[in-house]
Regions:
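Active-site acidic/histidine clusters and adjacent loop/turn architecture
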Residues: 1-4
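Histidine-centered divalent-metal-coordination microenvironment in nucleic-acid enzymes
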Residues: 8, 22-41
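C-terminal accessory/tail domains of diverse enzymes
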Residues: 7-19, 42-174
Length: 174
């Protein structure tokens, strides 16, 4: 990831431009996420892997989103706010692509400020935790949580009160 960023920044500079990979470089536009895709060669293992990651996502958010700026995109402009999963649902912290409903997941909360090696280590640890605890994920969220907030803010709080939220600040993530 570092080499890629260096190449893009160098190429941009040589053309009189500036490339910025920070989580929220412009406050009026959506930010930059760094979605992490995970595949399992045994599809039947993916629900347990996902359950482990969901169980630990709150405590590893500090490492997936390590700067104050990281939290300016969480829950805003298409970045997830809730620790949940859904098939083809971009409003959830974990999205299961419809083309691979059992073998792939996408972690949508992380951003480019994270140390990718540490992020992968923590995600692997969280995924393996299911072996000890026999975790099972909650049912998938079908509702588009971005759209429901825009449509009815009063009812939104009632419908989402049972979802855990991703920490909304660096201090909360600690």
């Amino acid at each position: 990831a570092s080499t890629f960023k260096w190449i893009v920044r160098t190429k941009a500079a040589s053309n009189g431009l500036y490339a910025d990979f920070s989580p929220k470089p412009l406050s009026v536009y959506p930010g930059n996420g760094m979605h992490i895709n995970i595949s399992a060669n045994k599809e039947e293992k993916m629900p347990a892997i996902m359950a482990g990651i969901l169980a630990h996502l709150s405590e590893i958010t500090y490492f997936l989103n390590p700067s104050e700026e990281s939290y300016s995109r969480i829950g805003q402009s298409k970045a997830p706010k809730f620790i949940c999963w859904g098939t083809q649902n971009r409003s959830c912290a974990i999205r299961v692509p419809s083309k691979h409903p059992n073998g792939k997941i996408q972690i949508r909360s992380s951003d480019s400020e994270c140390n990718i090696y540490l992020a992968f280590t923590l995600l692997i640890y969280a995924a393996l935790d299911e072996k000890k605890k026999n975790l099972v994920p909650e049912p998938a969220v079908q509702e588009n949580l971005f759209q429901s907030y825009a449509e009815d803010k009063k009812d939104y709080e009632e419908r989402t009160k049972n979802y855990r939220t991703i920490p909304l600040s660096l201090a909360e993530a600690r």
